[in-house]
Amino acid sequence: MKFNSDEIASVLQAEIEQFDNKIDVREVGTVLEVGDGIARVYGLSGVMAGEMVEFANGSIGLAFNLEENSVGVIILGDYLTIEEGQEVKALGTLLSVPAGDAVIGRVLDPLGNPLDGKGPVQTDITRPVEIIATGVAERKPVTEPLQTGIKAIDSMTPIGRGQRELIIGDRKTGKTAIAIDAILNQKGQGVKCFYIAIGQKDSAVASVVDVLERHGAMEYTTVIAAGASAPAPLQYVAPYAGTAMAEHFMFNGGHALVVYDDLSKQATAYRQMSLLMRRPPGREAYPGDVFYCHSRLLERSSKLSDELGGGSITSLPIIETLEGEVSAYIPTNVISITDGQIYVQPDLFFSGVRPAMNPGISVSRVGGAAQTKAMKKVSGGLRLQLAAFRALEAFAQLGTDLDPATQAELDRGYRMVELLKQPQYQPLSVAEQVISIYAGTNGHLDDVAVKEVQRFEKELLQYVHDKHSSLISDLTATPALSDEIAERIVAAVKEFKTVYKPATPAA
């Protein structure tokens, strides 16, 4: 075999000229111990708080505790195949998730991996999971309404775009149902929705996805799921990841609605991680910074100034109470962070009042400014009316004889409570709500039997759609309730009463 020395020399010369003297310098550590979703690593002395690290099995971790001789890392993935003595690489980057239109309609885990069997998310857009919330100067007041389609909420505790409204109550009292109804009502409103399931049973998440698909809501919704079987670090990261995806739309001038279901379980996951990391426990064994864990999350929901595009994130955090104990640590923390709360009461729920919102202690601190003028006009005295009714109802139970005026007030109260009941997954438009509440507060239901109220309302709205469709379109187009429109509502109700056939006479 003959060698061509000139050819070998030219190849060597070309290789030397093309040689790129880049050295990939990475800090490498060693796993000292691992278990329960966390690892203690020796050797990563230059790692930053929140920096990503990579384990030998490909799992990603976050530097959580920076100690003198070791680093506490939370593992965002499979920790069962990580062993003591394995190598850990610092990646020099912060955790980020995919964002943009590609995530809409998908069911993802908190890292953006698909859970719906539709393949990876095809996008080049990513957003950091943790960012500092926008400052006061970069925001504007909440002025646009975000309609939930639920009469009791839109009339008494209205929500505006950019608001944080807490939904709080015991388990199985319809908290998730309120949030899902709010998502369903965003159809055609240009609002992107994010449902973040934290510590929920996989079967419960699957049923929520099924409801969203059946009602066509997955076209504008993303579900981020960290189920009950997911490691605590994933449950902890899930709300931040979902918010990061929503921020893409907010910073591009769009609007997003984020549901955190629920933050009690995120707090429990954070407590578990902190105790395993030997952080000192505080009240109810939660770490001292659990308030900051929730405040830095919820402060990212805002209404941006016009200079930044005027986008918004509206959030509906959910908190589960035990035996109605709203004065516990996590509930009081989140109540103080949010702009109001919807308190759902078990007694109301089991007596058939659904949604089971207690109007006495449910408030919206900033949503009133966002309420439409028509809704504000018809629902102005509704909260006081219902509060007075509850007091009268308690008084009437003593068996005292009531004068006719008090009895009439009590009877109207029963009808208003019945009117504010609403079946699940049947949100109403603002125009329909205005007609319905106007008829109730102005005494047009006083001669309708209490048991008939819901049927009367349903048939009335159908009648208005069929015979007075211009009234619906005028109410939708005009924010204020003029005297002329009010007269048309009264005329439509009176006209409907002539054709309405009650099943039972008025009580």
From Swiss-Prot:
This is ATP synthase subunit alpha 2. Its main location: membrane. It is an enzyme of class 7 (translocase). It is a peripheral membrane protein. One of its GO terms (molecular function) is ATP binding. Belongs to the ATPase alpha/beta chains family. The keyword Ion transport applies. It is found in: Cell inner membrane. F-type ATPases have 2 components, CF(1) - the catalytic core - and CF(0) - the membrane proton channel. CF(1) has five subunits: alpha(3), beta(3), gamma(1), delta(1), epsilon(1). CF(0) has three main subunits: a(1), b(2) and c(9-12). The alpha and beta chains form an alternating ring which encloses part of the gamma chain. CF(1) is attached to CF(0) by a central stalk formed by the gamma and epsilon chains, while a peripheral stalk is formed by the delta and b chains.
